[in-house]
Design a protein with these regions (language model features):
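Pyridoxal 5′-phosphate
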Residues: 1-404
Length: 404
């Protein structure tokens, strides 16, 4: 296990106060704070190696290109992808999913074809499919879940038909913390000859991800959820699928040759990377991945699992506490309501105590509909959080509860 005090010292923002109280940052499922090594690395590149990548023979361009492509290798190694050609840089998980949806549908789907998603998806894995449904006449089928937030795998198997073309599901629910059985989901889909896209935004920061062991066909995640910068994300895709999918956007860098008559496209991964990439952010992402690798993903998972269990046990002491997402082995998310206290009131009053939590539907309105509530309060944990902070949260909830 790592030294939590030493780790916290790596994150400058954790030492600040909010309303004259120490910051207790528990909104990590929305975005994580950044260690100084990431901030320093990005600043250093802007100061000493800022030039467009893949476009110049001069020193600065070559240096920036080297850092950018080294970041691609770092990502490949981190998720155990077979080839760097299968690592595509995007703006985030949302764009990664949209890339797959748009390009896959154009190549492989037509009117009447079906996609399977789950009842716990983030809007980013619902709306893009709905846009294609309106455009192409495809249909969405939804895997139901029980009251604990667990997917009904028997129902999942029954959703397949000769029209099923792809399965697209979250690895971990951003609202419930449910860790879905992705290996089984992939196996069942592959038994039907169907590829699988995994939304890894909420899994990648919390435990080791191995896309080869998972055998998924596509995997998406964001840099800012794993202590890296905003505006950078990753799409892993098996070469056999990416090769057959058309470009998502057109522009510079993704072309081989252009004339007024026709354009031919670059090989992977550049076919899907039109325009100037955020090459400083890719470097920042690589440094963030190296940071968590040095701490050990198993150590991070163990620490956050202890925090989650401790939080659930402490919060269970509070009268009229209602949890959303109670599956065994759930990830570092605790969503709740207390009595009739509105989630916005709870979040606003906790904020005045220096405690940052998320309130609302968490871009998962169908989940809220499933449980019959307009929104919930969500506390979500990271590698730098402590049991003392959870004690502060519990004390804050009790204090707010006494006001109603």
């Amino acid at each position: 296990m790592y030294d939590i005090n030493k780790v916290r010292a790596d994150f400058p923002i954790l030492s600040r106060t909010v309303y004259d109280r120490p910051l207790v940052y528990l909104d990590n499922a929305a975005t994580t704070q950044k260690p100084l090594c990431v901030l320093d690395a990005m600043r250093d590149e802007y100061l000493n190696a800022n030039a467009n990548v893949h476009r110049g023979v001069h020193y600065l361009s070559q240096r920036a290109t080297d850092l950018h492509e080294a970041a691609r290798e770092t990502v490949r190694r981190f998720i155990n992808a077979p080839k760097t050609e299968e690592i595509i840089f995007t703006r985030g998980t949302t764009e990664s999913i949209n890339l797959v949806v748009s390009s896959f549908c154009e190549a492989f789907m037509s009117e009447g074809d079906e996609v399977i998603i789950s009842a716990m998806e983030h809007h980013s894995n619902i709306v893009p499919w709905q846009l294609q449904a309106a455009k192409r006449g495809i249909a969405l089928k939804v895997i139901p879940m029980d009251d604990s937030g667990k997917l009904d795998m028997e129902a999942y198997e029954k959703l397949f038909s000769e029209k099923t073309r792809i399965v697209s599901v979250a690895h971990v629910s951003n609202t419930l913390g449910t860790v879905n059985p992705v290996k089984e989901i992939v196996r069942i889909a592959h038994d039907h000859g169907v590829p699988v896209l995994i939304d890894g935004a909420q899994s990648t920061p919390h435990f080791a991800v191995d896309v080869q062991a998972m055998d998924c066909d596509f995997f998406a995640f964001s840099g800012h959820k794993i202590y890296g910068p905003t505006g950078i994300g990753v799409l892993y895709g098996k070469e056999e699928w990416l090769d057959r999918m058309p470009p998502y956007q057109g522009g510079g860098e993704m072309i081989e040759s252009v004339s007024f008559e026709k354009t031919t496209f670059e090989k992977l991964p550049f076919k899907f990377e039109a325009g100037t990439p955020d090459y400083v952010a890719t470097h920042g992402l690589a440094v963030a991945l190296d940071y968590v690798t040095a701490l050990g993903m198993d150590n991070i998972a163990r620490h956050e699992h202890e925090l989650t269990e401790y939080c659930m046990n402490r919060m269970a002491e509070i009268p009229d506490m209602r949890f959303f997402g109670t599956t065994e082995g759930k990830d570092a998310v605790v969503s709740f309501l207390v009595g009739n206290i509105h989630h916005l009131d709870m979040g606003t009053l906790l904020d005045r105590l220096g405690i940052a939590v998320r309130t609302g539907h968490h871009c998962a309105q169908p989940v809220m509909d499933r449980f019959g509530v307009p929104g919930v309060v969500r506390a979500s944990f990271a590698l730098y959080n402590t049991k003392d902070e959870i004690d502060t949260l519990v004390a804050g909830i009790k204090r707010v509860s006494q006001m109603f």
